[in-house]
Amino acid sequence: MRKAEVKRKTRETDIYVELNIDGKGNYDIATGIGFFDHMLSLFAKHGLFDLKVVAKGDLEVDTHHTVEDVGIVLGNAFLKAAGDKKSIKRFSTFYVPMDEALVRVSVDISGRPFLYCDLPLKAERVGNFETENVEEFLRAFAYNFGITLHVELLHGSNSHHIIEATFKALGRALDEALRIDERVEGIPSTKGIL
């Protein structure tokens, strides 16, 4: 089983993440940000990851530090749990619709951190969650996991639907890219490392 526990404490946040890549989609999420908890739950459920996230942050300021730092710690947990990445599929693209919204997420478990994000969101907030933090979370996650991540809105207008489709698609794409393919011998790269 590919598992990891990661803790990170700063003056702004105290984050704990427990991850099992080869899980069943069980989750226990408590960040103090209701909408973000919902999104992380969807991510775990649809990615079939067992995920526990406990976060305490300076929410009296805003949600930015907590959301970004969860992305950092979650990215570190995936990096640790993925291990040597032998025999993984490596690439995946997943489309997820939610009503009028259609989002495409493409991942390369490459060791080369990069984020391309084209998610125009009309609402400034969903609940107490600032929507600009979606991109901050994705960037922190991609850079700390060391993956290339492309996230694009193809259609849609409702910010809640767009964000929800994004987290579901990210979970599905990572599930596929991290799957073990017995046909792949060793590292899935001509360089010999990822």
UniProtKB/Swiss-Prot annotation:
Keyword Lyase among record annotations:
yes
Q: Where is the signal peptide?
A: none
Where is it found, in Gene Ontology cellular component terms?
cytoplasm
Pathway noted in the entry:
Amino-acid biosynthesis; L-histidine biosynthesis; L-histidine from 5-phospho-alpha-D-ribose 1-diphosphate: step 6/9
Catalytic activity as recorded in UniProt: D-erythro-1-(imidazol-4-yl)glycerol 3-phosphate = 3-(imidazol-4-yl)-2-oxopropyl phosphate + H2O
Please give the Pfam families that the UniProt record associates with this protein: IGPD
Intracellular or extracellular location(s): Cytoplasm
The GO annotation for biological process reads: L-histidine biosynthetic process
Keywords of the record, alphabetical order, are: Amino-acid biosynthesis, Cytoplasm, Histidine biosynthesis, Lyase
UniProt EC number: 4.2.1.19
Record-linked InterPro entries: IGPD_sf, ImidazoleglycerolP_deHydtase, ImidazoleglycerP_deHydtase_CS, Ribosomal_Su5_D2-typ_SF
Looking at its record, which EC class is this enzyme?
Answer: lyase
Q: Which GO terms describe its molecular function?
A: imidazoleglycerol-phosphate dehydratase activity
For this protein, the record's NCBIfam families field holds:
PRK00951.2-1 (NF002111), PRK00951.2-2 (NF002112), PRK00951.2-4 (NF002114)
Indicate the family of this protein: Belongs to the imidazoleglycerol-phosphate dehydratase family.
Known HAMAP family for this protein? HisB (MF_00076)
Please give the name of this protein.
Imidazoleglycerol-phosphate dehydratase
State the species of origin: Thermoanaerobacter pseudethanolicus (strain ATCC 33223 / 39E)
